[in-house]
């Protein structure tokens, strides 16, 4: 069996509107016939915890998929540089107050390629429960998958 050297991590919470974007993307990816070296994880709201426990010496590339608010049109997909993450509130701390940006930067500095695929959300409903993505964000799921498949081939 081929070692897993690419880790795709979907972050977010399906109960809070567009925050579930990363979960929706990895749900679709899990049903696809991906190369043997790719591992897909739905980290939910515990992205930092999963990343800290799942990254081992075999991992060469991490692709994080998440809904992020960076003041663009809802549904806009943006590939985010690791250096931009501390400027995004969600990446300063995750739902468990674990700083994710410094951890991703540290992985990057250790030679692991870190790619963050963000989607501009329209409705982040926390603390109010509202399952389901907005129409704009739902339409962006396939575009994100297309970008991720391109990243896998690099």
UniProtKB/Swiss-Prot annotation:
It holds the Pfam family HycI. Disulfide bonds: none annotated. CDD domains: H2MP_F420-Reduc. NCBIfam families: frhD (TIGR00130), hydrog_prot (TIGR00072). Its EC number is 3.4.23.-. It comes from Methanocaldococcus jannaschii (strain ATCC 43067 / DSM 2661 / JAL-1 / JCM 10045 / NBRC 100440). One of its GO terms (molecular function) is aspartic-type endopeptidase activity. Gene3D superfamilies: HybD-like (3.40.50.1450). InterPro entries: Pept_A31_F420-red_hyd_d, Pept_HybD-like_dom_sf, Peptidase_A31. Belongs to the peptidase A31 family. This is Putative hydrogenase maturation protease MJ0253. It is an enzyme of class 3 (hydrolase). Keywords: Aspartyl protease, Hydrolase, Protease. One of its GO terms (biological process) is protein modification process. It comes from the Archaea.
């Amino acid at each position: 069996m081929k070692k897993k050297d690419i880790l795709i991590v979907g972050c977010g919470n399906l109960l809070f509107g567009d925050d579930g974007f990363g979960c929706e993307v990895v749900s679709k990816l899990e049903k696809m016939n991906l190369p043997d070296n790719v591992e897909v994880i739905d980290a939910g709201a515990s992205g930092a915890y999963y990343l800290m426990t799942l990254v081992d010496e075999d991992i060469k590339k991490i692709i994080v998929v998440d809904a992020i608010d960076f003041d663009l049109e809802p549904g806009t997909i943006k590939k985010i540089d690791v250096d931009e993450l501390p400027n995004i509130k969600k990446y300063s701390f995750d739902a468990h107050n674990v700083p994710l940006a410094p951890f991703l930067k540290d992985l990057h500095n250790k030679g692991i390629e870190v790619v963050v695929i963000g989607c501009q959300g329209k409705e982040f409903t926390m603390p109010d429960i509202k399952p389901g993505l907005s129409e704009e964000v739902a339409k962006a799921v396939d575009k994100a998958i297309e970008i991720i498949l391109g990243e896998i081939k690099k």
